[in-house]
Curated annotation (Swiss-Prot):
Belongs to the eIF-3 subunit F family. Component of the eukaryotic translation initiation factor 3 (eIF-3) complex, which is involved in protein synthesis of a specialized repertoire of mRNAs and, together with other initiation factors, stimulates binding of mRNA and methionyl-tRNAi to the 40S ribosome. The eIF-3 complex specifically targets and initiates translation of a subset of mRNAs involved in cell proliferation. GO terms for molecular function: metallopeptidase activity; translation initiation factor activity; translation initiation factor binding. Residues 11-145 form the MPN domain. It comes from Drosophila simulans. It comes from the Eukaryota. It holds the Pfam family JAB. The gene is eIF3f2. Its main location: cytoplasm. One of its GO terms (biological process) is formation of cytoplasmic translation initiation complex. This is Eukaryotic translation initiation factor 3 subunit F-2. Gene3D superfamilies: Cytidine Deaminase, domain 2 (3.40.140.10). Keywords: Cytoplasm, Initiation factor, Protein biosynthesis. It is found in: Cytoplasm.
Amino acid sequence: MSRNLSMRAKVFLKPLVLFQIIDAYDRRPKGDNQVMGTLLGRNKEDHIEITNCFTVPHKEHSENKRIDLDMTYASEVLELNMFAYPNERVLGWFCTGKSVSRSASLIHDYYVRECGERQPLHLLVDASLKNQRLSTRLYCAVEMGVPGGTKGLMFSLVPLEISSENSDLLAMRCIEKQSQQQASKQMERFAPELVQVVDATRDIQQRLDLLLRYINDVLARKKKPDNVVGRSLQAALTAVPLLDSEKFRLMFNTNLRDMLMAITLSTMIKTQLEISEKLSCMQDQ
């Protein structure tokens, strides 16, 4: 593929990537002004999907505004990620800040080798949340200069669209619901996961009631049938395997136990990380 394809192809960004960058910025080492790392995703024929990322440790030199990346760490984490997600490839790098840094061209040279034929993308995220908004901009480097003379790089803006699947939308609705609570409750933990399951089940029940009313109205000739809706319903019904109530109950209970185990383990890990952070702060003091 041509390197210029990155300038023409549509680029879709998954919300998970933004959450990972914000979390890394919030947990950045003391004294660091920004975080940066590698963007991962998939190259399609007509578009690019940024689906994952990981941070790369770096060292900032204030005297010459230069940034050194830990290349060994980046290579090792990338190799591990390829085992877990073999379909993901390096698409470029991300950085937090308000503008493209002076060292962007040097970092660009490293990711040119990692991206192969495709031009690496540069995602700039302003994590300062100015005006309570998260600013995201995507750049692609273009060579410029006089033929036969010194050439440089110009980072041009590339259209970026945040793409969400059904699972992403469900998670973001839960986060939005919690963020709209009173200020006195903002620091409390999320509602128990089972409560969220009940809310989701109630929402599904309301949608099913609406669907049944529509079907009954069509059968009673109160509404005109729609072929598109009919084909969509048929596709949805055929996609769900036919199970009796006992098998469904067994499958649901098994998945519920797995979810509770995952919640317990994640809570233990979270508690361990919080204790580790507090101990690190005590040592710094």
